[in-house]
Structures are given as structure tokens and as C-alpha cells.
Amino acid sequence: MAKKVMALIKLQVEAGKANPSPPIGPALGQHGVNIMDFCKAFNARTANDAGSIIPVVITVYQDRSFTFITKTPPASMLLKRAAKISKGSGVPNRDKVGKVTHDQLVEIATLKMEDLNAADVDAAVSIIAGTARSMGIEVV
């Protein structure tokens, strides 16, 4: 018989740096999950992605056990890294803060393909290009 799901928790945690402090501790603690078990498992799984923010979906079961799925880093973070900027524009239509090439967009789209709702790479590239435009990054 399958375990009964008690909660789904979505967090964004820096790779390899999960610790019991907020936001992880309170989010897991209120469901009775062993926080250190999660932190050790997450840090072990994301050790080679150091410096990236990794979205994670934690499924908590009735017996207080858990499983988690790590996703690819957010497109905005990948675009900021590609354009070598620290943050996007406050007024993206007026102020352009950086530039990315089409090849960089294809690279990001293929990396994000499993998490995007796109049928092929061209559709994924247009999604990433839209994100870039909304951040004030020019696509060349």
C-alpha cells in the first residue's frame, strides 16, 4: 500500500549549503521531518552544483518520512550568469543591463528543457528569451 502524502513543500536552497536555519528548518519542522536528514541528503546530492540556487520539492508522508526532487536552477539565475550581471533591470523596457547571444539561450534552454513546458528546444528558447527580455537583458 502506498504511503499517504501529508504535505508538499517547495523551497529554493543554495546547492550544498542546506542547514536547519530558516527557511528550511521552520518549513520542515512544522511537518515533523528530521531536518538534519534532509540537509545531509540535499547537500550530498547537490555538492557538484556549488553556487547555484536549486529549487527542491519535498514530499512529506504521514509517517514523517520524506522524498525530494531537485530541479534545474531558475532561468533568471542562469541568464544573469550568462550576461555577467548581478541583477535584472528595474525598468526592462527602458534600461538594458546586459546582452546574451542566441547560442547562450540555446544552451540554457537545453539545460532547462526537463523543467519547461515546451515540446522542443525552439519553444524552450523562446520561453528563455522572454524571461531575458523581462529582466532587461538584450538578446543578440
Swiss-Prot record:
GO MF terms on file? large ribosomal subunit rRNA binding; structural constituent of ribosome
Give the Gene3D superfamilies listed for this entry: Ribosomal protein L11, C-terminal domain (1.10.10.250), Ribosomal protein L11/L12, N-terminal domain (3.30.1550.10)
Q: What's a Pfam family this protein contains?
A: Ribosomal_L11_N
What keywords does the record list, in alphabetical order? Methylation, Ribonucleoprotein, Ribosomal protein, RNA-binding, rRNA-binding
InterPro entries linked to this entry: Ribosomal_uL11, Ribosomal_uL11_bac-typ, Ribosomal_uL11_C, Ribosomal_uL11_C_sf, Ribosomal_uL11_N, Ribosomal_uL11_N_sf
Biological process terms from the Gene Ontology for this record are: translation
PTM info: One or more lysine residues are methylated.
Keyword match RNA-binding: yes
**Which domain of life, per UniProt?**
Bacteria
Look up keyword GTP-binding and say if it applies: no
Extract the SUPFAM superfamilies matched here: Ribosomal L11/L12e N-terminal domain, Ribosomal protein L11, C-terminal domain
The entry assigns this protein to a family as follows:
Belongs to the universal ribosomal protein uL11 family.
Known role: Forms part of the ribosomal stalk which helps the ribosome interact with GTP-bound translation factors.
Q: What is this protein called?
A: Large ribosomal subunit protein uL11
Give the encoding gene's name.
rplK
